[in-house]
UniProtKB/Swiss-Prot annotation:
Keywords: Aminoacyl-tRNA synthetase, ATP-binding, Cytoplasm, Ligase, Metal-binding, Nucleotide-binding, Protein biosynthesis, RNA-binding, tRNA-binding, Zinc. GO terms for biological process: alanyl-tRNA aminoacylation; negative regulation of DNA-templated transcription. It comes from Shewanella sp. (strain MR-7). Gene3D superfamilies: 2.40.30.130, 3.10.310.40, 3.30.54.20, 6.10.250.550, Bira Bifunctional Protein, Domain 2, Threonyl-trna Synthetase, Chain A, domain 2. GO terms for cellular component: cytosol. It is found in: Cytoplasm. The gene is alaS. It is an enzyme of class 6 (ligase). This is Alanine--tRNA ligase. GO terms for molecular function: alanine-tRNA ligase activity; aminoacyl-tRNA deacylase activity; ATP binding; tRNA binding; zinc ion binding. Its EC number is 6.1.1.7.
Amino acid sequence: MYQTTAALRSAFLEFFRSNGHQVVDSSSLVPGNDPTLLFTNAGMNQFKDVFLGMDKRSYTRATTAQRCVRAGGKHNDLDNVGYTARHHTFFEMLGNFSFGDYFKEDAIRFGWTFLTEVLKLPKERLCVTVYQTDDEAFEIWNKKIGVAAENIIRIGDNKGAPYASDNFWQMGDTGPCGPCTEIFYDHGDHIWGGRPGSPEEDGDRFIEIWNIVFMQYNRQASGEMLPLPKPSVDTGMGIERIAAIMQGVHSNYEIDIFRALIAKAAEIIGVTDLSNKSLRVIADHIRSCAFLVADGVMPSNEGRGYVLRRIIRRAVRHGNKLGATEAFFYKLVPTLIEVMGDAAKGLADTQVIVEKALKAEEEQFARTLERGLGILDSALNELQGDTLDGETVFKLYDTYGFPVDLTADVCRERNIIVDEAGFEAAMAEQRSRAQAAGNFGADYNAALKIDAETAFCGYSELTGNAKVTALYLNGESVPAINAGDDAVVVLDVTPFYAESGGQVGDKGVLVAQGIEFAVSDTQKFGQASGHKGTLTAGSLSVGQVLEAKVDKKLRHRTQLNHSVTHLLHAALRQVLGTHVTQKGSLVDPERLRFDFSHFEAVKPAELKQVEELVNTQIRRNHELKVAEMAIDEAKEKGAMALFGEKYDAQVRVVTMGDFSIELCGGTHVGRTGDIGLFKITSEGGIAAGVRRIEAVTGAAAMAYVAQQQAQLEEAAALLKGDTQSVVAKLKVQLDKMKQLEKDMQQLKDKLAAAASADLAGDAVVVNGVNVLIKKLEGVEAGALRGLQDELKQKLKSAVILLGVAQEGKVNLIAGVSNDLVGKVKAGELVAMVAAQVGGKGGGRPDMAQAGGSQPENLDAALSQVLPWITERLA
């Protein structure tokens, strides 16, 4: 019973569902609306605003099977993955949560009941820990649950600071925190290790399987602990650890999920030793990489994308170590989908894009991997001591794409340490890229906090009376503001849409007798809408009743652009494929910008098809239907969700005929015909696997078409024709240009042949070899190659160096006859000269080219060439 990981997941969720908990889907690995986190790393992340009192849900009890990643940032397990039994970059955290509902006693009882009655773990194999001062938890365990006092261990501050304890949980430097109690499983005395709190606690005998956090405080940047609005509960149980216990194995890598992935990786690569640690690394890394791509992260050189790149490249390196000779990593995705079962639904939906992203990154890295490993191997073989210098580490990073932890991984296998300080010094000028991943450490509490709620009436009304409930000046709450003040006004109800889902906030005015507040933007602050702007007349106090007036023209134009993004999204999926998902958008009154997943430039014919499809739906004049429904019902209807957004149990669904259905809280037109016209203005790539379309609608689209028509008419006039003949006349002109270029090249070749005859006479003989060093005047840089070829034919055994200085630049070419390349190499010759004229270059031993930016140094540089050649011909 409950032998498979999938069965355990189902049993856990069903147990808590039957105890009054709402089963909530795993949130994205990219945390929504939380600047303090790089990745979702705990089950409670998606409920952080609920714990802080900034968000409300329709339920007070929840249970989840949350996908988590710990790699990069503060929570980073990457270096240990593959070398220990329980470290992973990706794991599933089973959790149950109480938002001001039950507290310590029920939380403890739920955990104990599930482990001992549902899973039937022997009670004698379990012991628990509590925070040193948490007498309440101790008493519950001892008196209510019946755990003997000797099996309840108090853990104090053991990490060098107040509240720095294994039994005091905090997500970061700020945010929700509180004491916790943990349940440990004893694997038996045949495994080394001691109970928690003992000198041998780091052994593998006693393993933590359940952690219950009593969420009582919100830690400020100052260190102050403020009580949360309602005491809450956050629990977590790693599914991999409990699966190992239920399946009778000690290492997480021996459970069903990992056995299947390891076996498949071994089959693809051709490995027979299934205990190889590199297979463990690969099996772990495919989980984090595949789910990260599925959640919208693409390999890049900054932020989350760079962490993903590091993980992929570490896996590829381990595959290379096992003998992989071609792309293998992406081939594990189907097996991953199969073994993850219901937890892989989102991954299955994006399988095509995930496989393409992983394959593209693997193939890109493969081009430099072998050479980089060769350089690293040589450096390690020549190393005296046990430390690899930072310069070599930087070279591998900068030239061959080796993340530092990949180099450290190789060094670790040979008991070599990496000079990280030296590496940091070497890449100081490029640190901005690598530091992007650290920019997620912003103080979550630094943003303006508004403890109020604003009702939104702007779906149906653009004007309405409202009462001022709060005023903020320079980030501080104030009772009143005066004319000229830039402030934030909070109302009890508003028709102003607050920026969300890519749609910009409304503009307009708030007015009363003698009072006018010009709203330049509307933003969300928790449950409140903040109207940002300037008081242009009068004075304004909390409690004042105003008339709120949205700028109707701006709202209308914004609605055109928002509604058409839904049509565009659906059209892209029809034309390019269902792997297309929205990665972001910007909708304002002037234009729309739509980012989406796709692995190549959209072909002109495809763009035309998308545009025509959208305009067809506009002409069909579909009525936009809006409905409130449960999120599960919306998903069953096929509603598309917006990337990065968080959704409650009840959602708003916008439908346009049978063409588009999306979850959306934004404002829209009444019918698609209101959009009038849709015109794409640009398409391009913004990141690996992410494309961007910019477009206009309505009057802006008409103006764009008129501008294009005017340019076409101007071109027709220049070509002395009409708009119908522009293409034909351009083809004629292009054909003429091609013929002129051909004629010109033939003339240049004749001139080069004539010039070479004259130049050949300037050669000097050095040890029986013709040497020609010449600065040329009136010769185009493009003619150097042909001239050099002519001279080599005439001079036979020769070394040639020609230079041209024009328009502030230097062009160089070196040629060496085949009989001399053993003594003089053209690449070395041209590089020597280029270095003296502010440039660089290279090429083959018999021919090489270079450029420079210091023509004033060319004469001096050429004067050194003859001695340099003479020395090598001696």
